[in-house]
Amino acid sequence: MFRFPVSLGGSRDEDRHDQITPLDDHRVVVDEVDFFSEKRDRVSRENINDDDDEGNKVLIKMEGSRVEENDRSRDVNIGLNLLTANTGSDESTVDDGLSMDMEDKRAKIENAQLQEELKKMKIENQRLRDMLSQATTNFNALQMQLVAVMRQQEQRNSSQDHLLAQESKAEGRKRQELQIMVPRQFMDLGPSSGAAEHGAEVSSEERTTVRSGSPPSLLESSNPRENGKRLLGREESSEESESNAWGNPNKVPKHNPSSSNSNGNRNGNVIDQSAAEATMRKARVSVRARSEAAMISDGCQWRKYGQKMAKGNPCPRAYYRCTMAGGCPVRKQVQRCAEDRSILITTYEGNHNHPLPPAATAMASTTTAAASMLLSGSMSSQDGLMNPTNLLARAILPCSSSMATISASAPFPTITLDLTNSPNGNNPNMTTNNPLMQFAQRPGFNPAVLPQVVGQAMYNNQQQSKFSGLQLPAQPLQIAATSSVAESVSAASAAIASDPNFAAALAAAITSIMNGSSHQNNNTNNNNVATSNNDSRQ
């Protein structure tokens, strides 16, 4: 920046006015800034020189090239750095010292600006470093959390696997204990094959339960449709195996003795005997009764798990399983008779492994005793099914040839209890020679007692039988009855044990029950009469 010292008037102007000579009259004094003082001085000097040459008596006022300090104090600083005095040369009027100062100041200013920018960049760099450090810290924390979660998940999975393994082992031990402690079911051959047969009869869903370690009830409730399909498939496969086995005689060496004797050695006979016994692993009890309902009421709780159409019968066959306890092996099939739609055929298979309610003991005891005695009579020889001298034939067939029949047309022995036949008047011998029918026609006979008596009679007679290679459950079925019925059953048991003929024993048992009931009714009537007489006397 350039500074021009300017004087706007003052004592110097007055002094100059006092010193004005006549030669300076042509100069005009103005109160303005004269920016051309140098030129004016040059012209004035030339004029003075000319005057000197002419008269040599001209007064010349010499102006100094520098402005006095006291005059400079009155100058106005306009910031232009201009000089009003002559520097004595033709050089630039810009002061070299001032220009150098300006350059230094400019450099300092730029340096200060650069320093400020550097400071800002340092601050920004520090902020970025802090952000990077925070991000690194967060990443490390998340990584540690992820590792901890993965370890917890692995520990949880390992603990679950360990628990599942323990549960499966416990389930296996329980099954082994059940194989040892629980009595064999009535469809097995003998006590020696209890463990092997139990292992062979384990269904697919039970094997799945052992692998997974889950209880059977959870698996059944989780997917009942799949369980029903599997069970239905098992029933169908068993029926197909029955039809295929009995359709081709070569598959059953029991009914082909020539093939077993053709070898003429002892090993072949042993193999044929084992095959024949394997054929008799299960027994089924079929009950025919007239009912309009979908199934007869036997006191148990059932769940339907399948249905299919059978050959030769337009009515579908329904499959049920007992749901009163988890893992109960009892199954039943319900189907209408093709010839008479009013007859409902119910086929039971298996034995309950849980306590039964009073309403279910009658049918369960009857079917269990019938199947057990059927197997006990069939194990004596290969012709045991067809031999009328076996225990069951001697027990039931003399009573009524139409009440119970034994089927040998299937690999599994089946006994059919026909409850639809009524006494026929055209055949008087059936009623005369049948003690069971005689007592069934007596007045006051209660049909609900018959299954209990038959079941208990079969049970006691089977205990006394020498043909039986079986053992019924150690815990007998619980028959919930009144005290009078219990006394009647005990009397029937004593009569059956003392009489070798089952028909006569059964007749004696029913007689004792009827007499006990009538005696109890007479006692009740006598007590009522005595009470009424006492009341009237009072």
Swiss-Prot record:
Q: Where is the composition biased (Basic and acidic residues)?
A: 168-177, 198-209, 226-236
Offer an example of a GO molecular function term for this protein.
DNA-binding transcription factor activity
Which of UniProt's keywords are assigned here? DNA-binding, Nucleus, Transcription, Transcription regulation
Spell out the disulfide connections: none
| Residues annotated to bind DNA | 291-357
Report the superkingdom from the record.
Eukaryota
Q: Which PROSITE patterns match?
A: WRKY (PS50811)
Compositionally skewed regions (Low complexity) per UniProt: 248-270
One GO cellular component assignment for this chain's record is: nucleus
Enumerate the subcellular locations listed in this protein's record, separating them with semicolons. Nucleus
For bias type Polar residues, the affected ranges are 210-225
Q: Where is this region: Disordered?
A: 153-277, 517-538
Does Disulfide bond appear among the keywords? no
Location (main, coarse): nucleus
Q: What does this protein do?
A: Transcription factor. Interacts specifically with the W box (5'-(T)TGAC[CT]-3'), a frequently occurring elicitor-responsive cis-acting element.
Q: What is this protein called?
A: Probable WRKY transcription factor 31
- Write down the species: Arabidopsis thaliana
Give the gene name. Answer: WRKY31
